[in-house]
UniProtKB/Swiss-Prot annotation:
Pfam families: Sugar_tr (PF00083). GO terms for cellular component: fungal-type vacuole membrane; membrane. Residues 289-313 are annotated as: Disordered. PROSITE patterns: MFS, SUGAR_TRANSPORT_1, SUGAR_TRANSPORT_2. This is Probable metabolite transport protein YDR387C. Keywords: Membrane, Sugar transport, Transmembrane, Transmembrane helix, Transport.
Length: 555
């Protein structure tokens, strides 16, 4: 590894913290893990953000059906105004996705989620009591900010607090919470459709999960990786005891030592003059058998004294602290304090692929059905136009499970190439259904489209962050999320106006055109990375985009 590569790979500490998983204290990870009531409460509580994400993005379909002009002091509620109400959440989510990582790194994952839930509550109340269009749009913008932050922070938090044995399950649970939240919003809207001003109740109900999260906040620990990066050993130890209730003091302390070793190695590339425990930006809380205190950097002698006297927290501390000073490997500049902002060409190519695939995820029209399904099917004089949206959301929910169990086994590229073709067929059938007023054909074709979408396109673009080197993942995840929300906002802001201008059937043809473009994009530029290490993923983008690297190398 060259000096430039070393500086580039290790320059961003906090983006790497979230990736320190596989080599962190194997002893504690190998313990049998049994979910207790308290640990279940922690993990379920952490997924409340995903539930709110799904509910607040799905609820708008039922709201638009029950919202009346006089409710907002209007003479008429135009399609453009409906589009503004709908798309304002996506606009807010764009800004939320930008704020997510800075907030999570500065205040911690737990506090950031608490801030999100507070915003969810405030926005829910504001939207429920809104008497003007402007006030309602402001409420939707506010909830969008919370959605954008939680969409980024919840998976990060879960990946950092989950034991390796259940990490995949917990991340899956978050996806289930999102799609389940959308389904719940449709079901509740259907049950409340005969109630006057039901849209106010639909908005108000979104405050309940947020209140539940705040009520159990004291039982949810901070990410150990974040707290150790801040030098708070005492809090890290308490968090680990909550997350691993069967672990002994030895296992907990081993985990802490391994975390410190990993993080200190990373910091060597920024400033190797002092190990993590005595770096100038860290204030270490340290508890030994008789005392607890705050150790500031100048108190090096006191630190040495404490570590020598402490047997439970850190054994052989003098040798341990000396070991942390190990040389930066491969000639990296140990005293480098400058942050490198230049991205390598291969990183730029990888980021473009991720953003483009996310663009196609949204421009192919999925959220047009999610947001406006009730309006779409109300044109066909269906007794309950909220029943088709429930079927659509149920299809999305069920086939999301299919995606989670096939992406790694079949490969993302292979499943994308197959399901995008099915999406295209579904949209073409939608166009026929609209053109001939065949509601049954329309419903079947939408279900086909949504099933294919949920099987790959709904999930795969979010995994493109794995194309990026560790020190660019936070930035790359924000870019990919921003692409999602901006394209989402564009589709939701123009859909009703478009169908009024060129008709439903032609709008479906436009979506079908973009799915064809997406297929060619995947075929020529989206590589398969199944089973590749981080270094090998980088090689895929070394000279252009080698989409056949896996097959040429391993088959």
């Amino acid at each position: 590894m060259s000096t430039d590569e070393s500086e580039d790979v290790y320059s961003d500490l906090y983006s790497i913290i979230s990736q320190v998983t596989s080599n962190t204290a194997n002893d504690i990870e190998q313990l049998p893990y049994a979910l207790t009531f308290k640990t279940s409460l922690i993990f379920v509580g952490a997924t409340i953000g995903g539930l709110l994400f799904g509910y607040d993005t799905g609820v708008i379909s039922g709201v638009l059906l029950s919202l009346k002009p006089e409710d907002l002091s209007l003479v008429v509620l135009t399609d453009v105004q409906k589009e503004l109400i709908t798309s304002s959440t996506s606009v807010g989510s764009f800004f939320g996705s930008i704020l997510a990582f800075p907030l999570a790194d500065r205040y911690g994952r737990r506090i950031t989620l608490a801030i999100c839930c507070s915003i969810f509550i405030l926005a829910a109340i504001g939207m429920a009591i809104a008497r003007t269009l402007t006030f309602l749009i402001c409420g939707r913008l506010l909830v969008g900010i919370a959605v954008g932050v939680s969409a980024q922070c919840v998976p990060l938090f879960l990946s950092e607090i989950s034991p390796s044995r259940i990490r995949g399950f917990m991340l899956t649970l978050n996806i289930i919470a999102i799609t389940g939240g959308q389904l719940v919003s449709y079901v509740i809207a259907s049950l409340m459709k005969e109630i006057d001003n039901s849209w106010r109740y639909l908005f108000a109900l979104s405050a309940i999960p947020a209140i539940l999260f705040l009520s159990i906040l004291d039982f949810i620990p901070e990410s150990p990786r974040w707290s150790i990066s801040k030098g708070d050993i005492l809090y890290t130890r308490d968090s680990l005891r909550m997350l691993y209730p069967t672990a002994s003091t030895y296992h907990v302390n081993s985990k802490i030592k391994q975390l410190i070793i990993e993080l200190d190695k990373l910091r060597l590339y920024e400033d190797a003059s002092e190990p993590l425990l005595v770096q100038s930006q860290s204030v270490i809380r340290y508890m030994d058998s008789s005392t607890s205190g705050t150790l500031s950097p100048p108190n090096i002698k006191r630190l040495s004294s404490n570590t020598e006297r402490t047997s439970n927290t850190m054994s052989s501390s003098s040798a341990y602290l000396s070991a942390l000073r190990g040389p930066a490997p491969n000639g990296a500049l140990a005293s480098n304090k400058k942050k490198r902002h230049r991205m390598e060409p291969r990183t730029i190519r990888a980021l473009i692929v991720g953003c483009m695939l996310m663009f196609f995820q949204q421009i192919t029209g999925f959220n047009a059905f999610m947001y406006y399904a009730a309006i779409i099917f109300s044109k066909f004089n269906i007794k309950n136009p909220l029943l088709p949206p429930i079927l659509i959301a149920s299809t999305n929910f069920i086939f999301t499970f299919f995606a989670m169990y096939t992406m790694d086994s079949l490969g993302r590229r292979a499943i994308l190439l197959r399901t995008i073709l099915i999406m295209t067929v579904g949209l073409l059938l939608c166009s026929v259904g609209f053109g001939h007023d065949q509601v049954n054909l329309l419903l079947i074709s939408v279900v086909i489209y949504v099933a294919a979408y949920a099987s790959a396109m709904g999930s795969v673009p979010w995994t493109c962050v794995e194309f990026l080197p560790l020190n660019r993942r936070s930035f790359g995840a924000s870019c990919i999320a921003c692409t999602n929300w901006l394209t989402n906002a564009f589709v939701s802001m123009t859909y009703l106006s478009t169908i009024n201008t060129i008709g439903d059937e032609n709008t479906m043809l436009i979506f079908a055109f973009f799915t064809v473009c997406a297929w060619f994009f995947v075929y020529f530029w989206y590589p398969e990375v199944k089973g590749l290490s981080l270094e090998e993923v980088g090689r895929v983008f070394d000279n252009g985009i080698d989409v056949h690297y896996v097959f040429r190398t391993y088959h």
